[in-house]
Regions:
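C-terminal structured subdomain/cap of oxidoreductase catalytic cores
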Residues: 1, 5-10, 14-26, 79, ...
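A glycine- and small-residue-enriched flexible loop/hinge segment at structural boundaries
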Residues: 79, 87-97
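A glycine-rich dinucleotide-binding beta-alpha-beta segment and adjacent secondary-structure elements
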Residues: 57-65, 119-187
Length: 221
């Protein structure tokens, strides 16, 4: 029920940018992390901004992935395949993204700020004009497309009362044979944790009480 979520704390959401860029970008390695000097203020915008004042931080601490740096097959010849993740508050009102600037105006403006920041901080002055494909995704996309509570990208925050065995269990206490797996549950957020969560559901169903990983999937009867 909706009331169950009222006292829960959502983890961060994100502004995501998927960029196809003409020409090679020697300034970016496969992984690049950019941090603002005012760390405390930057992350306060992500975790503690009041309702009605939640937005994409500017400047922002962010992550850049340039997979074509090590695997040229993920981009056309003489192009780069760039992914950018900017942590934001879990607030759908921050906006919805789209393809080639078709998203909400304020979210696309925030994406422009991020691109300008990367260009400035990494020494790529012509980055914006070299972008040939652009897709953005914001908290409203997580809420609308993925049904993510509060538009979070990471599920329930790992506060003390929402960590480890304090997180929701993987089996319903009200509906027989209803099981759950995902980032809101035990053991936690992130793709590896979600896969482990699915493994724990399987082991519960087949009554496997071992501590080791599954060696072979067995039919569920």
């Amino acid at each position: 029920p909706t009331s169950w979520w009222e006292n829960k704390v959502a983890g961060p959401s994100a502004l995501l940018l998927y960029l196809g860029v003409r020409g090679k970008i020697d300034e970016l390695d496969h992984h690049t992390l950019l941090y603002t000097k005012d760390w405390k203020s930057n992350f306060a915008e992500v975790f503690h901004a009041p309702d009605g004042n939640r937005k994409v931080p500017n400047p922002a601490s962010l992550y850049i992935c340039n997979p074509s740096k090590t695997d040229p097959s993920v981009a056309p010849p003489d192009h780069e395949n760039i992914f950018v993740l900017v942590p934001t508050a879990a607030e759908p009102a921050i906006g919805q993204g789209g393809i080639n600037r078709s998203g909400d105006e304020k979210l696309e403006a925030a994406a422009d700020q991020v691109i300008a920041q990367i260009a400035d901080w990494c020494g790529i002055p012509d980055l914006a004009e070299r972008i040939v494909v652009r897709r953005t995704m914001g908290p409203a996309d997580f809420a609308g497309e993925l049904n993510a509570w509060s538009g979070t990208a990471l599920g329930m925050a790992h506060t003390l009362g929402q960590s480890a065995f304090f997180r929701p269990k993987n089996m319903s206490s009200k509906v027989s044979n209803l099981y759950y797996a995902g980032h809101n549950l035990v053991p936690g957020i992130g793709l590896p944790m979600c896969l482990i969560g699915a493994e724990l559901v399987y082991k519960r169903i087949v009554d496997d009480r071992s501590a080791s990983a599954i060696a072979e999937l067995k039919p569920i009867k």
